[in-house]
């Protein structure tokens, strides 16, 4: 055998091993140490990388919904990721090319997780982070023992609707330079039970925002305001507020929102959808309909995503 062929075989073996390590079926599951039925969870980890990798990919599996961030940039792209059947908790993995978000030095990977419906889940996310160095050699960046987590400001109600907390209480949860004193080590699921994972890597069905529109008209009914969109929609609701009181409670359809008290703020669903034509907004004793600056319906649609585009 020639030296060239020998080196080629060795290179192929190295590539195979690196890809095997990054195989989503071999990823280790993790969860908040004390999972409950309704909590959304933030996960984060920091990686020290001497040189910016030539390529970098993250394969993330989840039994619920997630948003993936690298250095504060949302790399997920779609909404309600991954697309799944209602009230399902099967494990689904998606692979993302995160090369353009990488840098030399500290790289922070963060995940916002939500259960797909109210239920306790011992396996929440699993993640594999890998790529290639400047010399072409494979790199696996995983360090499961360093993952931290804490409950997010949002959660689900027992009926499966979204409860939005005050975002200003942790505005930079996915950034590098935050105080992690109140964060806990993620619980690594150590059993050997095989969990089937549906892996979506090239072309798959996903959900995106297809149209944004405002109401046709609104009516003031007592202490509430009803916004009529003319025709029913399925998607997210986004409400822009001004001069709300910090801690003020609002009901926006089935969604609950606690105001941050900033001059301008937005309440928007993240992991649930609304299906309606008329949207009722009300609040506590501090609520004033003049606080509502804009109400928008962000209609969603299912499409085929091509990760090679």
Map each language-model feature to its residues.
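Sec-dependent N-terminal signal peptides
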Residues: 6-15
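Extracellular/oxidizing-compartment recognition motifs
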Residues: 23-309
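N-terminal secretory signal peptides that target proteins for export/translocation
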Residues: 1-2
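Bacterial Sec-dependent signal peptides at the C-terminal "C-region" and cleavage site
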Residues: 14-26
């Amino acid at each position: 055998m020639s030296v060239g062929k020998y080196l080629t075989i060795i290179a192929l073996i190295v590539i195979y091993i690196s890809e095997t390590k990054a195989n989503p079926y071999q990823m280790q599951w993790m969860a908040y140490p004390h999972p409950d039925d309704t909590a959304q969870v933030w996960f984060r980890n920091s990686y020290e990388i001497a040189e910016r990798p030539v390529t970098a990919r993250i394969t993330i599996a989840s039994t619920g919904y997630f948003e993936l961030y690298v250095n504060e940039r949302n790399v997920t792209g779609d909404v309600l990721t991954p697309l799944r059947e209602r009230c399902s908790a099967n494990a689904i993995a998606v692979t993302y090319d995160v090369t353009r978000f990488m840098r030399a030095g500290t790289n922070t990977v963060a995940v916002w997780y939500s259960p797909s419906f109210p239920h306790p889940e011992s396996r929440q996310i699993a993640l594999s982070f890998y790529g290639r160095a400047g010399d072409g050699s494979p790199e696996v960046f995983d360090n499961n023992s360093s993952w931290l987590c804490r409950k997010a400001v949002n959660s689900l109600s027992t009926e499966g609707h979204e409860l939005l907390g005050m975002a200003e209480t942790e505005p930079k949860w996915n950034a590098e330079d935050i105080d992690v004193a109140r964060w806990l080590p993620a619980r690594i699921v150590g059993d050997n039970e095989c969990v089937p994972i549906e892996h979506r890597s090239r072309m798959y069905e996903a959900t995106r925002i297809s149209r944004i529109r405002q109401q046709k008209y609104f009516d003031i009914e007592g202490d509430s305001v009803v916004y009529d969109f003319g025709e029913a929609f399925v998607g997210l609701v986004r409400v822009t507020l001004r001069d709300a009181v910090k801690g003020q409670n609002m009901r926006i359809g089935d969604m609950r929102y606690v105001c941050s008290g900033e001059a301008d703020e937005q309440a928007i669903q993240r992991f649930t959808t609304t299906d309606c034509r008329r949207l009722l907004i009300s609040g506590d004793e501090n609520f004033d309909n003049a606080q509502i600056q804009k109400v928008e319906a962000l209609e969603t649609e299912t499409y085929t995503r091509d990760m090679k585009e």
